[in-house]
């Protein structure tokens, strides 16, 4: 009999509140970021919902904004994801 394994439930996730703060501090609109980084509006919308995006998207944003990954995202407990920084 084949046994199926259940994945362990995640306790943390990434959020992008640091990105939104960085954009505000620099006076950059999301549409401008989209053009600067050549990232789709759908990817930016996913980030707004704390959903997964590809590492390519993250690298493009870091290059466009001349910043590090830590400047735009952080790992937080799932229960606190919406309110972190």
Over which residues does each language-model region extend?
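Recognition helix of helix-turn-helix/homeodomain-like DNA-binding domains
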Residues: 39-53
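A short, Lys/Arg-rich alpha-helix, primarily the initiator
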Residues: 1-29
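Short, basic-rich loop-to-helix N-cap that marks the start of a DNA-contacting helix
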Residues: 50-63
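Short C-terminal boundary/hinge segments that cap the last helix of small helical domains
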Residues: 66-81
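Residues in the helix-turn-helix
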Residues: 32, 43, 57, 71
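The alpha-helix within a helix-turn-helix
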Residues: 23, 34, 48, 62
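Residue-level detection of the helix-turn-helix DNA-binding "recognition helix"
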Residues: 24, 38, 49, 77
